[in-house]
């Protein structure tokens, strides 16, 4: 008789052992209830935060260097592609943005890959992870997560609809480092919640992605034609670009 094998989810095992709960639907409901109660996003100032991000991109694209300096237009950041110490992957992303933005210095790479999103949340919410802050609620054992990923996209990396303070215990369920039903259900609920609360901003993002799509496609075509970059590196880079510059289903 052939032995039957089971699918074993480490998260379900954890909840069963510590809380006596092994029903995935119930676990999923409780996870989301806890998340809604304990997570913090840019809410009251979401319009200002979104307007500021888009204005800075537009100014860096269209205004003179003197105007940018005089008006103190702050930098616009994206996450590094691949290994931070890899000059080839760094150069790829920089070349992409110079192509997209007609050789204008619009973006900078976030040296820590999370400093800019943290600063954005710190600026536009009443919460911070800075333990020495004197005028905000200080969060411990929280981290910054991206609801939709898209961390190579300057319109998304620090967008108010994409950054959230989550308790570290919940971070695995956002889907970046784990798989399975619980992760899928939690990620879906988080994204649907954000879509319902930031719908107009996401619509604007989608329109921008539609406008940029021809340039993204042409860049990929031209850089592939050069033939001087490793095939595996290009394949991964194109995959990351597709994920970061795709529209969000509403």
Model-predicted segments: where are they?
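Mixed-charge, low-complexity interaction segments
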Residues: 1-112, 181-187
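Generic detector of well-ordered alpha-helical segments enriched in charged/polar residues
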Residues: 12, 16, 28-32, 118-125, ...
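Generic surface-pattern signal
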Residues: 20, 36, 40, 58, ...
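A broadly used, surface-exposed interaction patch
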Residues: 105-135
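Histidine-centered nuclease catalytic patch
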Residues: 123-165, 171-178
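Polybasic, low-complexity binding patches
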Residues: 156-158, 173-216
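Short, surface-exposed linear patches
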Residues: 164-168, 187-190
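C-terminal, well-folded lobe of enzymatic/effector domains
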Residues: 209-250
């Amino acid at each position: 008789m052939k032995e039957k094998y089971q699918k074993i989810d480490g998260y379900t095992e954890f909840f069963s052992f510590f809380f006596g709960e092994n029903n995935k639907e119930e676990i999923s409901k409780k996870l989301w209830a806890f998340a809604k109660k304990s997570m913090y996003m840019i809410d009251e100032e979401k319009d200002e935060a979104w307007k500021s991000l888009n204005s800075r991109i537009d100014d860096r694209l269209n205004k003179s260097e003197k105007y940018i300096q005089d008006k103190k237009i702050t930098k616009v950041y994206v996450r590094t592609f691949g290994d931070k110490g890899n000059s080839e992957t760094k150069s790829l992303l920089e070349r992409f943005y110079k192509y997209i933005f007609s050789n204008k210095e619009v973006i900078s790479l976030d040296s820590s890959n999370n400093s800019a999103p943290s600063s954005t949340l710190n600026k536009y919410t009443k919460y911070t992870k800075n333990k020495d802050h004197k005028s905000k609620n200080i969060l411990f054992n929280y981290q910054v997560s991206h609801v939709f990923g898209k961390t190579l996209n300057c319109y998304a990396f620090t967008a108010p609809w994409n950054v959230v303070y989550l308790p570290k215990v919940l971070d695995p369920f956002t889907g970046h480092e784990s798989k399975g039903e619980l992760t899928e259900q939690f990620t879906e609920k988080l994204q649907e919640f954000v879509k319902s609360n930031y719908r107009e901003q996401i619509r604007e993002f989608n329109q921008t992605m539609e406008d940029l799509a021809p340039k993204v496609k042409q860049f990929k075509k031209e850089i592939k034609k050069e033939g001087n970059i490793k095939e595996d590196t290009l394949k991964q880079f194109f995959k990351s670009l597709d994920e970061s510059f795709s529209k969000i289903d509403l």
